[in-house]
């Protein structure tokens, strides 16, 4: 069993003429996107409001939805696998930590992603504790309510939940 995030294998990301159109829109949010990010590279995505940054991040995380939610063209790959099929390889920290705080207790919230990966219970809780330590919430009890957390604590809790999953790609 490993709780060491540093032992996680970094993921490579490739886009081939990728685009996405939300079902409620006439025009594509992004179109003809091409890039190749090698494992371990760090990339900054910068752009104006409405430029498609969140759409690309959601696409990489595999959470854009099916055909009823929009139309995809081209390929968006993580380690050569369609991003929609590689969800466990990618961790997404949302802009608004309140939208990522799902459960009532800090430990449950941190463990949530690992539970969805069907990891053994002991490993889930070891990873959750290690992730809370990494983000500076080592003092936080697993049964601590998420309701009274400050904005900064919520952001760190969201990051801990993602790090506990040991993603190869952190967004």
Task: Please describe what each predicted stretch is.
Residues 2-32, 64-69:
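A short, flexible loop at the N-terminus of ABC-type nucleotide-binding domains that lies
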Residues 159:
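Hydrophobic anchor residue at the start of the ABC signature
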Residues 61:
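Helix-to-loop junction immediately C-terminal to a conserved catalytic motif
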Residues 46-48:
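The feature captures the beta-strand-to-loop junction immediately N-terminal to the Walker
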Residues 123-140:
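Conserved ABC ATPase "signature" region
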Residues 166:
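Conserved catalytic motifs of ABC-family nucleotide-binding domains
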Residues 145-149, 153:
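Conserved ABC ATPase signature
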